[in-house]
Amino acid sequence: MDPKVNVVPPALHLVDPQIQMTITRMEDAVVHDQNNAGPKVYPIILRLGSQLSLSMAKRNLDSLEARAFQSTPIVVKMTKLATTEELPDEFVVVTAK
């Protein structure tokens, strides 16, 4: 098994790694694909908290301080299940406000 496949920063508390959301605001997506107008779909990692906000992150950056940037709120909808093995380099992190 590839050790890089299931890497999750320990600061992220997994509630359910099998949840996926669809980003419906393309300007907030990490991947800037101007040729594709359809919504990008990224697996998400849930963090414990009553209120939720979205931020984008790259899992392959070295430090937690460098890995994330805040985005404006993103309109999302639940889609099909995804496992942590399917996480791309860019994924959505849901954090408590």
UniProtKB/Swiss-Prot annotation:
Signal sequence extent: none
Disulfide bonds: none
Domain of life of the native organism: Viruses
Pfam families the UniProt entry points to: bCoV_lipid_BD (PF09399)
Chief location of this protein within or outside the cell: host cell
GO cellular component: host cell cytoplasmic vesicle membrane; membrane
Annotated localization: Host cytoplasmic vesicle membrane; Host cytoplasm
Xref: PROSITE patterns: SARS_9B
More details: The gene encoding this protein is included within the N gene (alternative ORF). Bat coronavirus HKU3 is highly similar to SARS-CoV (SARS-like).
Protein name: Protein 9b
